[in-house]
């Protein structure tokens, strides 16, 4: 992928008030996107957002920029990212825009785009938008200005879509489910989906106030969910992130079930139902235990770079339909065009109903190897990964693992972080080794 000035692996993201997440930049971005997208014919753009307080400001800026370029905006209000992808397709809009920083704190926000078919914008379109950003802003003639409206039934449309991905001959009657919606975009969607399918639903993280999104809740912090599942004697728990494109689950014992385990269960079920096309795609961060478990089932497995867009690219290259990240992004191309936490969770619930098995038992065919991830924040222009000391210590750790584990160092695509991952057979050892490398990264440069 070429070096781009603004777009990262998941759109444009940053701290609100700091460049580039400022009202003037986002207005210019809306205008530039409008200029590029208007060339393709349709003049309607769907705009959704999560529950961050800054969403109001940024959607107004986007609307102004798009209108100046002659495009109209249709607002969904707070809506999961995959819902915007779905609505973009069903409304035949030229593009969808999501205002969200996903799992980040409330003071961050971001802008990401979907194309007319509900997939991430191609690199060349993002590059064209960046090129347009360098030009002076102009305004179309008054008669050609864009308009704005709200899609009043957006939530209901998406709820019905989600329910449609669950087998019609099944129901969730008799299942008690705890939902953690991260005080984010799924707060008014997921509880209704599961209740309408018959579940007894207990909710947490469903009271967004603009600043509590992802705060000690949701897919990135399931401790409260684990506690509530056990307290409520629930069958299962589901946690979504702030924009609803990922899911992490908790079994009836309070044990966390991550994206690798979710991918394993869905792949095994698809194989048993004769619905698995080819193999499945994970990432460089996927646990070795997933690879080994899939190998036992005879299911081909490939690793993509980290990022759901790269999982999707690999699936398209191979002509396969199923992929996931261990963070909980699950892509089911037979049902959706992008990661969808609610839809992925429904497939696991369906497997529980079909097999009359608990989530804990469904996971029993796969053993996760100990894996430790340490995030190290860095600043400045130096690249810690090029430090001679970091390189040497990483090599010594690989020697110590002696072929019975993995080491991965990579830059985050959305934050100024170096992610240090060490995987092996012994939990204590991999923890110590990961922190040894992290200390070297911290002091590099």
From Swiss-Prot:
Catalysed reactions, semicolon-separated: alpha-D-glucosamine 1-phosphate = D-glucosamine 6-phosphate
Keyword Plastid in annotation: no
UniProt PTM comment: Activated by phosphorylation.
Residues the entry annotates as binding Mg(2+): 102, 241, 243, 245
Keywords for the protein's UniProt record, in alphabetical order: Isomerase, Magnesium, Metal-binding, Phosphoprotein
Disulfide bonds: none
Cofactor: how bound: Binds 1 Mg(2+) ion per subunit.
Enzyme class: isomerase
Gene Ontology biological-process annotations: carbohydrate metabolic process; peptidoglycan biosynthetic process; UDP-N-acetylglucosamine biosynthetic process
EC number(s) on file: 5.4.2.10
Single annotated GO MF: phosphomannomutase activity
Family annotation (InterPro entries): A-D-PHexomutase_a/b/a-I (IPR005844), A-D-PHexomutase_a/b/a-I/II/III (IPR016055), A-D-PHexomutase_a/b/a-II (IPR005845), A-D-PHexomutase_a/b/a-III (IPR005846), A-D-PHexomutase_C (IPR005843), A-D-PHexomutase_C_sf (IPR036900), A-D-PHexomutase_CS (IPR016066), Alpha-D-phosphohexomutase_SF (IPR005841)
Active site: 102 (phosphoserine intermediate)
Residue(s) carrying Phosphoserine: 102
Known cofactor(s): Mg(2+)
PROSITE patterns the UniProt entry points to: PGM_PMM
Gene Ontology CC: cytosol
PANTHER family: PHOSPHOGLUCOMUTASE (ALPHA-D-GLUCOSE-1,6-BISPHOSPHATE-DEPENDENT) (PTHR42946:SF1), PHOSPHOHEXOSE MUTASE (PTHR42946)
Function description: Catalyzes the conversion of glucosamine-6-phosphate to glucosamine-1-phosphate.
The protein's name: Phosphoglucosamine mutase
Gene source species: Photorhabdus laumondii subsp. laumondii (strain DSM 15139 / CIP 105565 / TT01) (Photorhabdus luminescens subsp. laumondii)
């Amino acid at each position: 992928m070429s070096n781009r000035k603004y777009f990262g692996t998941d759109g444009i993201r940053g701290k609100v008030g700091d460049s580039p997440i400022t009202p003037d930049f986002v207005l210019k971005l809306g205008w530039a996107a409008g200029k590029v997208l208007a060339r393709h014919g349709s003049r309607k753009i769907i705009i959704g957002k999560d529950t961050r307080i800054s969403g109001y400001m940024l959607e107004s800026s986007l609307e102004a920029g798009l209108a100046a370029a002659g495009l109209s905006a249709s607002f969904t209000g707070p809506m999961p990212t995959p819902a915007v992808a779905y609505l973009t397709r069903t409304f035949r809009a030229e593009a969808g825009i999501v205002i969200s920083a996903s799992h980040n704190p409330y003071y961050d926000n971001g802008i990401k785009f979907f194309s007319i078919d509900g997939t991430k914008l191609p690199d060349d379109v993002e590059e064209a938008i960046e090129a347009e950003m360098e030009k002076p802003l102009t305004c179309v003639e008054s008669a050609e200005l864009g308009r704005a409206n709200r899609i009043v039934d957006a939530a209901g449309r998406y709820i019905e879509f989600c329910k449609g991905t669950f087998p019609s001959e099944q129901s969730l009657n008799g299942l008690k489910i705890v939902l953690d919606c991260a005080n984010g975009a799924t707060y008014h969607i997921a509880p209704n989906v599961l209740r309408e399918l018959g579940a007894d639903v207990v909710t947490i993280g469903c009271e967004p106030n603009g600043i509590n999104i992802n705060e000690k809740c949701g897919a990135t912090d399931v401790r409260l969910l684990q506690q509530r599942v056990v307290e409520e004697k629930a069958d299962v728990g589901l946690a979504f992130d702030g924009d609803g494109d990922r899911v992490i689950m908790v079994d009836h014992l309070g044990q966390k079930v991550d994206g690798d385990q979710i991918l394993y269960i869905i792949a095994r079920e698809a194989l048993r139902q004769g619905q698995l096309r080819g193999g499945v795609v994970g990432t460089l961060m996927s646990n070795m235990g997933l690879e080994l478990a899939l190998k036992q089932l005879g299911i081909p497995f490939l690793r993509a770079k980290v990022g759901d867009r790269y999982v999707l690219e690999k699936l398209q290259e191979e002509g396969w339909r199923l992929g996931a990240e261990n963070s909980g992004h699950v892509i089911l191309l037979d049902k959706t065009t992008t990661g969808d936490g609610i839809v992925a969770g429904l497939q696991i619930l369906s497997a529980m109903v079909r097999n009359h098995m608990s989530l804990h038992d469904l996971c029993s065919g796969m053993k996760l190897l100990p894996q430790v991830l340490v995030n190290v924040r860095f600043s400045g222009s130096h690249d810690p990964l090029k430090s001679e000391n970091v390189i040497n210590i990483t090599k010594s750790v690989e020697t110590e693992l002696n072929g019975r584990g993995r080491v991965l160092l990579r830059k985050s695509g959305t934050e100024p972080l170096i992610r240090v991952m060490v995987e092996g057979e012994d939990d204590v050892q991999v923890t110590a080794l990961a922190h040894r490398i992290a200390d070297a990264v911290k002091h590099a440069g």
